[in-house]
Amino acid sequence: MVVKVGVAKLGNIASGVMAELLLDERADREDMQTFMATSGTKLQPEDIDRVVSNMKAWKPDFAIVVSPNGVLPGPTGAREQLAAAGIPVIIITDDVTTKKEWEEVKNSKFGYIIMKADSMIGARREFLDPIEMADFNGNLVKVLAITGAFRKLQLALDKVIDQVKAGKKGTEIELPKIVMTTDKAVDGEFTNDYALAKARAAHEIAIAVAGQNVKGCFMTKEWEKYIPIVASAHEMMRIAAVLCDEAREIEKAGDGILRQPHKKDGVLVRKTKLVAKFE
């Protein structure tokens, strides 16, 4: 059986850059296929409608809806339309900001993976040009990858694929309900305690970036004040990426990097030694 996984990208977060790639890292899996539809950078109704119509036409076994601020009308409407078409939906988004919004997500029929460290960017014109945008996202992808946040996301999605392969469909599928805290991200990722400490620090810094960018983008009006605020947030993310590099180099020095690739049938194999066969 070939499982059809739909990925609807509405706007951009770092998790959306990698969502389908994490499931088929060498493009050689034979047990699943992905279809990605995107609204581009915007969340306008016409952009959302285009994504939803293409996704419904493809008829995936389940769909992943990736967006910033997943409680906005656009992403909310998209997942409601997909669910109405009988497609199980998993939300991947950045941190949900209020208790009311969180309760609505938690009590909904949708699966969710809340990526707390997938922080918003410093989107002030006086600061953010295309290169700054790309640099920030590159640092953030590194943090989410090396801390373990991406692995936990990938494993959760693989479990859903496995359920479909086992014959489950629709409401029979158990969808993930995960808040990606620092504890959850780093769990089982490191053999060296100093590497673990650096990764924890990196993930916590990345979470804190969101607060600074909210302050700089929405709470501060004077340009001479908000420019340094958003710039400082990007410096925080850069340091988080440096800490991740340091953590990985420590793990390399002890020949302890965990590798878990997919086989062609989707089964995960693992090893922790570079020059070694899989366990």
From Swiss-Prot:
GO BP terms in the entry: methanogenesis, from carbon dioxide; one-carbon metabolic process
Designated name of the protein: F420-dependent methylenetetrahydromethanopterin dehydrogenase
Assigned protein family: Belongs to the MTD family.
Enzyme's top EC category: oxidoreductase
Role: Catalyzes the reversible reduction of methenyl-H(4)MPT(+) to methylene-H(4)MPT.
InterPro entries: MTD (IPR002844), MTD_sf (IPR036080)
Organism listed in the record: Methanoregula boonei (strain DSM 21154 / JCM 14090 / 6A8)
Keywords linked to the UniProt accession: Methanogenesis, One-carbon metabolism, Oxidoreductase
Superkingdom classification of source: Archaea
Metabolic or biological pathway, per its Swiss-Prot or TrEMBL entry: One-carbon metabolism; methanogenesis from CO(2); 5,10-methylene-5,6,7,8-tetrahydromethanopterin from 5,10-methenyl-5,6,7,8-tetrahydromethanopterin (coenzyme F420 route): step 1/1
Keyword presence, Oxidoreductase: yes
Catalytic activity line of the entry: 5,10-methylenetetrahydromethanopterin + oxidized coenzyme F420-(gamma-L-Glu)(n) + 2 H(+) = 5,10-methenyl-5,6,7,8-tetrahydromethanopterin + reduced coenzyme F420-(gamma-L-Glu)(n)
EC number: 1.5.98.1
SUPFAM superfamilies per UniProt: F420-dependent methylenetetrahydromethanopterin dehydrogenase (MTD)
GO MF, one example: ferredoxin hydrogenase activity
Name of the gene: mtd
Signal sequence annotation: none
Keyword Oxidoreductase tagged: yes
